[in-house]
Amino acid sequence: FPTRRSSDLKDNVICVEDEGRGMPVDMHASGVPTVQVIYTVLHAGGKFSTEGGYKTSGGLHGVGASVVNALSEWVEVTVHRDGKIYRMSFSDGGREVSKLEVIGKTNKTGSKVRFKADKTMFSTTKYSFHQIAERAQEDAFLLEGLKLVVRDEREGKEREEVYHYEQGLVAFMEYLHEDKQVFHKPVAFSGMSNDIKVDCAFQYTDEYQENIFSFVNIVRTKDGGTHETGDRKSTRLNSSHS
């Protein structure tokens, strides 16, 4: 994944930019540019492909980009790839406004997406900086080494937060327990089985109530799941032998 990603908020327009390899712009088997498929076709992601898929992805179904497009007044996609700058735009829930075109040259790589939510689809289109920043910080903990910059450029609300953690889940533990009495340093480990990577960290404190934060594909699973059930069993087994 890219080493840096930024999210800007101005005039209630979201702008997300990264320094990755840039979304693919070559022709898809369906006869349209791949970037267009990403933003107009459900389940078009490659997160479950074992060859050429994503190493890191968010969510499960591969619908994020196309759903954002469907629920936006307009979307503008800019891609820096192979020495060229590409741009494509949509409006009114995904209608193509301008075809993918080359608008310049570049010596960098990455993608930038700007969009404005369709106010007819939501009760409010005013964004909470706190919620966006909180999610960005979680991502930074889970994707160690990635720098996330969140900026609010709305008049009278200007602020910026930068999140960057080289120690990932260890840093997450330290953040969660910074005002608590702990009994040891955070313990972190990871493993791979059947192409599924699992990362885990834990730390015992003087609190009676346990707190478990579980994620799948960097999305919080507040309702738990088999991954959380397995973690609870393993920590209880560890406690019984302590």
Segments (PLM) and residue ranges:
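Ser/Thr-centric signal marking residues that sit
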Residues: 3, 109-111, 221, 235
